[in-house]
Amino acid sequence: MILGLALIPSKSFQEAVDSYRKRYDKQYSRIKPHVTIKAPFEIEDGDLDSVIEQVRARINGIPAVEVHATKASSFKPTNNVIYFKVAKTDDLEELFNRFNGEDFYGEAEHVFVPHFTIAQGLSSQEFEDIFGQVALAGVDHKEIIDELTLLRFDDDEDKWKVIETFKLA
């Protein structure tokens, strides 16, 4: 079973992000807009209850987090992904760190860059065209997210599904 942990924003911000993703993100139908807290990791089916208990224990003392999408940015030249950058806060960093050590299904492969992906799978020309438009349009959205979401990848439907949400203090 493949799981992941994410912060999922309000419906209104999901709609704003999805207005780009529908056009520019081939992964659009697989998952809602989100900030990844724990990248996909694999467990045995019988370990799900244990993972849920570990998540509950690890979020203890973590407050609801402020998410402030500040501008369009990209991972170029590594890859042609465009995203809305989220300002890194101590609370976001702490939440990420609690789930990205050897004691919880391994360390993160990448440094923590909180963001909402809006475009991926682009050719270099597409990237240049789209990035200019998105950067010009800009973004300045702030909200409090008070739940951490545990997701499972459904192979049959080729998409991520919510297993459980956990209230942040």
Curated annotation (Swiss-Prot):
Sequence motif HXTX 1, residues: 34-37
Short sequence motif HXTX 2: positions: 115-118
Domain of life: Bacteria
Name of the molecule in the record: Putative phosphoesterase SaurJH9_1013
Molecular function per GO: hydrolase activity, acting on ester bonds
Key word Hydrolase present: yes
Enzyme class: hydrolase
Family annotation (PANTHER family): PHOSPHOESTERASE SAOUHSC_00951-RELATED, PHOSPHOESTERASE YJCG-RELATED
InterPro entries: 2H_phosphoesterase_YjcG-like (IPR050580), Cyclic_Pdiesterase (IPR009097), YjcG (IPR022932)
Active site: 34 (proton donor), 115 (proton acceptor)
Family: Belongs to the 2H phosphoesterase superfamily. YjcG family.
Enzyme Commission designation: 3.1.-.-
Keywords in alphabetical order: Hydrolase
